[in-house]
Amino acid sequence: MDKINSQRKKLIIAITLLIIIILGLGITYAWLIQIVNGEKIQSMRVGTFRFSLTEENSLTINSGEFLKDSDGLKQEGFKFTVQNVGKGYGSYSVYLDDDSISSGQTRIDDKFIRYSLGINADTTGTPTNLTSRKIYSGGLDASEKDTFVLRLWLNPAVNGDIGGQVFKVKLRIEANQQIPTPVADKLLAGVGNNGTIDTTDPEQTFITGTDPNNYIWYSGKLWRAVSIDPSDNSVKLVTQWNISSIPYNADGNTAFQGSYMEQWLNDTSVDGFLGNLREPDKFIKTDSVWNATSTTETTKPAKTTMVTDAVGLLNVYEYTMSNKNAIDFTGYLNNDLYWWTLTPYSTSNVRNVYDHGNVNNCSPTISRGSRPSINLKSAVKIIDGDGTVDNPYRLQGDNDSPTGALLSTRYSGEYISFGTGENNLYRIVSHENGTGTKITSAIPLKESSSYKSIKFGSNVTFTKDNTIGTFLNGDYLTSGTYLTSDQVNMIEDNTTWYLGTVGSGTNYKLAKYQDATSSSLTTSTTTAQIGLLRLGELMAGQFDIYGNNTDYWTLTPLDASGVRDVRGSGHVYDSSPTNSDGSRPSMNLKSTVKIVSGTGIKSDPFVISN
């Protein structure tokens, strides 16, 4: 009864409900219930945790009819409810899996299927191609429920003969329950075989080792837990990767307080780091005290220079402690990139970590990577994950699934399924234009598995008509090689790109503003649909080890003969515009773009639709 044929008769499709509840204890319970017709309620209880699923009516599809979205959305749909009637929080995901078909039958290719998933008040949902079998992820506190309406139809935009083919699926719900645990308690209970808890410092309990289970995902970024403050159980984090790369300060000024770096970290503007953190007053200690004392040693510094800020950097002692139970700088904080520490070495040099993991010092005018550090409040709790890189700890209140929400409500660093082939992952940068969402490719563009190199142009000024601008606003945008037509329609027609010059040792703000006060925008601008990131912009860093990445262009000139580029080792230098570098296309998506599914992490990026 599942065959698609030319008679255009209405068919009932069999939906198999596979409900899996996975507890934090690692025990899995599974039920397989075959639903064909009628009204049934299936309820699963494990201890005090239970999900209920109500099947209100069977799913129908018009056989042989390729429906417009407007007609597909008129279908009654398949209704079900997921409810947490236990006492604890539970996260869950909804999958649309292939069900078994009979011998001799042929399964319809997913490209022919469109679907919508209405959720709660949004009973309609957004028409979406079936490109991912995970169609929803979310979480429920005790007594909460989510009500869904699933509609499926054949996609009229796809040509092909599917006569006699079969579409048969099963609805799978995976649920996970963990008792919310304070971050400090979870870490102190153990960080895996490749890490150790070190209590030799009475003021900081350090996590040491080569690769402890201390990964945390928060506000669109992957962090490592570094230490616990025994006085209040707050937890110090640092980003795993370089979020950007800027000069530390002007020549001869190595103090953290008042530096370019302090400004960048604590910038609350629309494109600032702190301004793009999720609910900082809820998650982090905004009055954290940072030891920025100058020292030539790597041992614990005196408390000579203490700075109060929401965001800081790790000092050289904290980095050194991470290597305590490792050899040859193989500690977990060595990310094989160049990055700044908080610690001045002298009045002319600041401590930084090299790509091999050794500590060195250099002029503050040089652009090294920025790895922001924050202190989580003691009340923040872990709700999911196991602390590994593939399954980082998730924080209660930051573990939502914003299906149906506007992309413009989300956070810098979150991942988006966008683009095609090997260039199909992008990240949110900011909401610089106020209504839409600025995004950039997660890595420089690739071509046949290798990074694509391109000249900047004949001079240092980016326009849609110079070499790289012509490519970005031509072949990249229109050829179909890098973007689908639906994705192109999500992009704003025009964006203003800021082209301010940032000379050696000058403030990163000059890339966008006339001066360091940020009171007036630079007059050096251009208009184009697709551009690049500028020096110091969020996500203008490196997010893999040196050797797995490549150099790439920014928009920002150094002077009349050089353009700033982000090197594979994580620092910013400059290159002649006639040289070739990688490119990370950047653009503003329209304010109407919505999230269809996904949680925004690298392994489960947001799927979006206009």
Where in the sequence are the language-model features?
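Short, polar/proline-rich extracytoplasmic segments that appear immediately after membrane translocation
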Residues: 2-71, 163-167, 172-181
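Short structured motifs
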Residues: 57-67, 76-79, 95-96, 129-137, ...
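C-terminal, structured domain-capping segment
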Residues: 74-90, 97, 135-180
